[in-house]
Amino acid sequence: MLDPKFLRNDIEQTALRLASRGYTLDVELLNQLEEKRKILQITTETLQAERNSRSKEVGQAAKRGEDITPLRTEMGLLGERLDSAKEDFALLAEQIKSLAYSMPNLPHESAPLGKDESENVEILKWGEPKKFDFEVKDHVDLGEALDGLDFKSAVKISGSRFIVMRGKIAKLHRALAQYMLDLHTDHHGYTEMYVPYLVNADSLYGTGQLPKFGDDLFNTKPATEEGIGMSLIPTAEVPLTNMSRDMIYDESDLPLKLTAHTPCFRSEAGSYGRDTRGLIRQHQFDKVEMVQFVHPEKSFEALEELTGHAEQVLKNLQLPYRKVVLCTGDMGFGATKTYDLEVWLPAQDQYREISSCSNIGDFQARRLQARFRPTGAKKPELLHTLNGSGLAVGRTLVAVLENYQLEDGSIEIPQVLQQYMGGLTHIG
């Protein structure tokens, strides 16, 4: 949620910054609502003061033995007017809050201007894509030939965009997740967490999935007037970030770094017809997520660090990748700046996203009331949150299968994973 001060004191500049990411701010409506808010606030405060004054007069008149019936009647009328004004104020505040919840975060000045992904800016490339002296196969053909990827059974059990893995491919998938967790906890300073896969609506509002992305969620019951019930997590960002909800940390506690390996569940409502083959876009997929809670002055430094942690996984797996900074029109709803890491997939002859690392600033913290108390200060301040994939496990499996394939269809196991595979060096 945006700082209300931006909407009250600098609405024109805020509108321009939001326009750079394709969002049209209704300045006229907001100005009208703000004017109503000011009037209602003054009315409420005036009526409250009058009621307090009349209450004193009643007490004084009673002491003098006077008839206080007229004063009590007047107080009753004031009370009714005050209750009505408070109700109007609450309804208006809810309307303003609803609008605020629909607004994306303000892009940072270092994010390049642009309309869509075609205007993202490449920062670097790492590693050289391998040149094969045979016709490369994609991960679907490789996995099915090794009896490790079973899409037919998944369709029978659940439908499209699901997968059944078996044998050594399933073990390789598990090994990737274990390796990522070990790297982040043993070398990058993260605390491993086990979190719920079902979350409530408050958690989803807190991290920004609601109200905008409700259609992308799997819910345990249909939406009702009372709410949507519980939802399967679209990413571990939701439960991990909600660890900070209504918390006040000491400054010395920061930064806090959390990581978790979870399945993620997405309806992919807006992805009809895209990536229908293979593991690239699934309703259920595994991901190792990284989340940080940091001092506001250090969040952009933390973004570079967190992105580097995701990059290290790719480097250690010897997977060629490129790093891009997203333009304003392609950033996620809550991000103020985002880096994407894209891994090389030989069968597609292109780089594909495997990690997205974002500085959210105080956007989530304001919704969550996630705060810290600066050393020597009495008043707590909002902290900054960051998140990133470290990495998407299924897409990493795709990259390993395709980049480490041999001419006979077998798969060489990356050296750093062999200890997780019982010393196995090849599959097939």
Swiss-Prot record:
This is Serine--tRNA ligase. One of its GO terms (molecular function) is serine-tRNA ligase activity. GO terms for biological process: selenocysteine biosynthetic process; seryl-tRNA aminoacylation. HAMAP family: Ser_tRNA_synth_type1. Belongs to the class-II aminoacyl-tRNA synthetase family. Type-1 seryl-tRNA synthetase subfamily. The keyword Transport does not apply. Keywords: Aminoacyl-tRNA synthetase, ATP-binding, Cytoplasm, Ligase, Nucleotide-binding, Protein biosynthesis. It comes from Psychromonas ingrahamii (strain DSM 17664 / CCUG 51855 / 37). It holds the Pfam family tRNA-synt_2b. ATP binds at R266, S267, E268, E353, I354, S355, S356. Pathway: Aminoacyl-tRNA biosynthesis; selenocysteinyl-tRNA(Sec) biosynthesis; L-seryl-tRNA(Sec) from L-serine and tRNA(Sec): step 1/1. Its EC number is 6.1.1.11. PANTHER family: SERINE--TRNA LIGASE, SERYL-TRNA SYNTHETASE. It comes from the Bacteria. Consists of two distinct domains, a catalytic core and a N-terminal extension that is involved in tRNA binding. One of its GO terms (cellular component) is cytoplasm. It is found in: Cytoplasm. It catalyses: tRNA(Ser) + L-serine + ATP = L-seryl-tRNA(Ser) + AMP + diphosphate + H(+); tRNA(Sec) + L-serine + ATP = L-seryl-tRNA(Sec) + AMP + diphosphate + H(+).
